[in-house]
C-alpha cells in the first residue's frame, strides 16, 4: 500500500493503534458488554451451540488420556493405588484448571467481549501502567506471540490426534482394521479440509446436538462401570493424588504429562467466548460437559480396577461389543468437530494477527452472509492440511502424538496465566497481595504440567516447539520489518500541512474528478501524492488522504468508524478505524463518508497507492537473513487492492525503492 510511515503496504494490514481504550469494566463480569444475564430460553440454545464449537477438543480427551497414563511411553502399572491416584489427578485438574482458572478467572479478562491469547495480548500492550509497565511490554509481547505460535501447532496436532484416536477404535472391534487406521484417518482429514472453502454454516447447526449425544453416551458408558464398582469414587479425595506422587516419585511426575491431556481444549473456552458469551459456556460446562467427563473417566478407572488388561484402550473397552462400531462413528464425528473448532480458530487467530500487524495480508473469504465470524483463509488451510498429513504419516498413531500435543497445550496455558495476571494488576487494579497468590497457584500447576512434558521433547515434543519457533520468527520478523520501514519513511516524510502551505493560496492546477491517496500516517504527505505533484503537477478537484487504523479492541462502534477533517486548499483527511476482528473495506468506508457529507462517485475516483520495492542491506536494524525473509513475505502478501476491496480498474500505483 502507501509508502508512508506506518502505512499498510506492501503486504501489511492497517497499522494497529497503540492507544485504544481498555475493555469496559462491565465486560469483566463474565459476559459480553451489553448482554447482561441471559434468560434460560436464550441461554439453552447458546449453551447447545457452545457444545458444538467450544467443547469438541476437551470432549475427545477421554479417547486417549487414561490410555496414555497406563500404557503410553511413560505409562504406569494400573494397580488399584495408581488408578485411584491418576483419577484424583484427573478430577482436580478439571476442577482447578478448567472450572476455576479458565471459567472463573481468565474468562473475566475479555477484550470487549472477545477472548483468546491475542485479544489478551492486545489488552496487555495497550498504553497504561506507567514506565515500569512499558519496560515489561516487549517481554510480554514476546510471550504472547510465542503462545499464539504454539496454538498453530495445536491446530495441526489436534486434528491428527483426535481423528486417529477415534478411528483406532476399529482396531478394538477387530484386529483386521488395524492396518487401515492411518489411511481411513487421512481420508477423513482430507475431506475435512476440502470442505472448508464451502463454510460450515449448514452442518454447523448439527454440531451442538451431535456433541450433546456424544457427552450423554460417554456418561452412560461411565455409569455402567461405576454401578459395578462405585468405590472408585474415593479418588475425589486429593489424598490419593498426594500418595500417588509419594509412592511413584519421578515416574509419577512423568505420568502427569499424560494427565494434562484431560484439560486440552481449555484455551478454546476462552478463545470462543466472543461467539457465545461466558455464561452459556459455563452453563454447558457445569450442566453437561464436566459431569459427563468425570463419569467417563471414573468409569474407565472402575474398568481398570476390574480388568487391568484393557489399559491399551479403556475408552472403547467400556462399550459392549454390539456398540463398538456406532461408538467409533460417534467418536469420529466428535473428533471432526474438535478438529473443525481448531481449524476455525487458526483462521480467526490469523485474521487477528494480520489486523494487529504481526502477519502480512492474506486472502480472507467470508463463507456466510449472516455470520461475520465464519471465515476461510485458503493459505492457512493449505498449510494446516500439509502439516496434518505429514504429522499423521510421521507419527502413525495417536499414542505417538500425545507427547507433542501436551507441550503445545501447557506452554500456551502458562503464558495465558502470566498475561491474565498483568491484566488483573494493571487493568483491574487488583492488589498484588490478592493477584499474586492466585496467579502463582495457577502458574505452579501449569509449570508442573509443562515440566512433565518437556522431558518428552525427543518423543515428539520437538514438533510444537519447532513450529512455535518458526512462526514466532515469522511474526516478529514481519513486525520488526514494518517498524524499520516506517522509521525510514518517517525520516523522509513531509508534514501534509507544510506541503500545502508551500503552495500559497492558489496551489497547483486542478483537474476534474476525485483522488484518494492511501496513507498509514495521517500527519504526513503520502509519497504517492508527492510523486503525483512532482511528475504531473496537478491536484484533483476533490483530493482525500485516507488512512486505515486497527485498534487494540475487537470491534469499533459504527459511530466511531470514520472521521473527516478539512485541510487547506480544499483537501480532506479521512481516518477509518477498525477492530482486530473486523475486515477493512473501501466500499464500507466510502459509504460512511457519504453519510458524513463527503460524496464520492466511484466511477470518477482514482485510488493512488504507493508500492515499495524493498532491498535488503547490511545496515543496522535487523539481521540480513531476517531482512531477506521480510522482503520475501512482503512480495508474497495479498495485494492491497484485493485486501481492501478497492475497484482494481480505479487504482494507480506509484513505486519507490527503499533500502532496509
Each language-model region and where it sits:
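The structured alpha-helical core of multi-pass membrane proteins
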Residues: 2-660
